[in-house]
């Protein structure tokens, strides 16, 4: 099982990513500007939960970047994502 969580580096998105990893999902964590937070979460999920995890940057307003995000998530997680959590927002 593979999931992509948009806005997954902090707050609710972070908790969703951890929740999914705890339940057996490999997780792609999307971020726009929170690279350090995303990288720390990837380390946590890999080391503490033993799941494949990757942080991927994209501007979700840009269609080409969204397509690249999905392709890279599929590539890095070893197959197509089966779960998409649209959590990204603008504060």
Model-derived segments and their meaning:
Residues 1-28:
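Canonical Rossmann dinucleotide-binding motif of NAD(H)/NADP(H)-dependent dehydrogenases/reductases
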Residues 87-91:
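Conserved NAD(P)H cofactor-binding loop of Rossmann-fold oxidoreductase domains
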Residues 27, 52-53:
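Hydrophobic anchor at the start of a short beta-strand
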Residues 49-52, 72-86:
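A glycine-rich helix->loop->beta "capping" turn
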Residues 23-40:
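Conserved glycine-rich Rossmann-like NAD(P)H-binding loop of the short-chain dehydrogenase/reductase
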Residues 35-36, 57-70:
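The beta1-alpha1 cofactor-binding region of Rossmann-like NAD(H)/NADP(H)-dependent oxidoreductases
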Residues 14, 18, 22, 39, ...:
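Amphipathic, non-transmembrane alpha-helical secondary structure
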Residues 41-49:
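Short, conserved SAM-binding/catalytic segment
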